[in-house]
Each structure stands twice: as structure tokens, then as C-alpha cells.
Amino acid sequence: MHDCSGLGPRSSGAPGRWAKELTRRGYLVMMPDSFTARGVPDGVCVAGPARGIDVSPERRARDAYAALAQLRQRPDVDGRRVGLMGGSHGGSTTLAAMRASGADTGEGFAAAVALYPRCATFRGIVYRPLAPLLILIGDKDDWTPAEECRKLAEAAAGAGHPVALKIYPGAHHSFDSPSPVRYVATRINPSVPGGRGATTGGHPEAWANSIQQVAAFFGRHLAVVPSRTQEKR
């Protein structure tokens, strides 16, 4: 699930990078565009959508389940082994989707990865993911602070719902971006006084390690389930 810049001309470039890495490893990748059809092709990083247009993470979670339903119609997809992944606004969408029931689509996602999501949304709530969940975030993130994700993971683990968390020292928001680190004063940011301004940009070491983390995580949780016949051999 893409970030607040969408998949249009203002895209951060991170979704495309991940698509290449995952397809290299044999995964089929679907990237739903939640913004263009709703009239916000330039994203919602700086200006929110017009009144009546809902592109919240909770609404986009429904997009994720719609994509899951489409994937399950393909003969080359094992519907039991579909993962969900998103960054920033898409990471928050991933958290919302992994907490929402997708009962109308059958079984839900088998595993999910949320990159630098807004964990503060679930402050004061014990987060219970519907499937194994991995969160990757930088400790220099001033847009979606890592400390909130640490609290979410600790509360979930304390309730018997472990959430895997990896925090990268020195990494900012969008550490998987090909762009250099920069501060943009106009970005909507509920995490700072005044509600504007955030730092984003790539961190080569965090990016390289995150590829390993995601590959290993999906490798464990989306692995082929042997049939009973195979198990007896």
C-alpha cells in the first residue's frame, strides 16, 4: 500500500523499489492506487483531500481487502499465502487492515509488513493483529515516531499478541526512499507542534537490512504449506 504521495508523479519511489525487490524473489506484486480514482492523484502529504473524499487508513484497509479478493481470483495465486505491505500512510493502512475483519473476503492476509506507520493511532489500545506482523521504522522519524511503535509492540506482546519490531538507528521517515534526507515544512504532521513539517529520506544501511528483514519474514510466513500427501512421503 503506497504512502501519502500516491503512485502518481509525486511518488516517493519507495513502492516501486519494493515491487522490484519482491518480484526478483518470485512474488507477484499488486499495488492498488487509492488516490487517483478518488480525485487526489498528487497525494495528501501537504494538502488533505476535499470534503467528502475519504482516503483514511481505515478506508484504504477496504482497498487492501478488495485487492486480496482480486488476487484470489487469479489461477497463479495461492489465496492462503497473500501478504500485505505498506509504507507511511500505507503502513498505517496496513495496521488498520490487520486489525479489521476481512471476513467477507474469506481468510485474511497471511502476514503483513508495516513500514514507519503511525502507531500513535492505537495509543491506549492493545493492538491485536490478525496475522504475523513486522514493523520497520527509524529512530530519527519525526513524522511517525518510533517510540509509539515500541509502545504498541510492547502492549501487544504483553497481551499475547507479539508484533515483530525493528528500529533503525539514524534512519528517518522513508528510509527506503531513493531520495536524500530533507526537511519539508509544508507536510501535514500531527506529531509536531503546529501540525506541519517532517523529515524524510533514504538511509542505505536501513534499506539494505529492511530488504533482508522483509524477505526472511515473508519467507517464513508465506512459505508453501505441504499437503498431507507430501507430509507422508
Predicted regions and their residues:
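The feature captures the conserved acid-bearing segment of alpha/beta-hydrolase catalytic domains
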Residues: 106, 110-170
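Hydrophobic residues in well-ordered beta-strands that form the structural core
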Residues: 31-32, 86, 165
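C-terminal catalytic histidine-bearing segment of alpha/beta-hydrolase fold enzymes
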Residues: 162-233
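Extracytoplasmic/secreted proteins, especially bacterial periplasmic and envelope-associated proteins
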Residues: 17, 21-24, 59, 63-66, ...
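Serine-hydrolase catalytic machinery in alpha/beta-hydrolase-like enzymes
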Residues: 1-73, 179-200
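Short phosphate-binding/catalytic loops that engage adenosine nucleotides
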Residues: 27, 76-77, 161
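Primarily recognizes the serine-hydrolase "nucleophile elbow" in alpha/beta-hydrolase
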Residues: 6-11, 54-130, 142
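Gly/Ala-rich phosphate-binding loop of Rossmann-like dinucleotide-binding domains
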Residues: 23-24, 98, 157
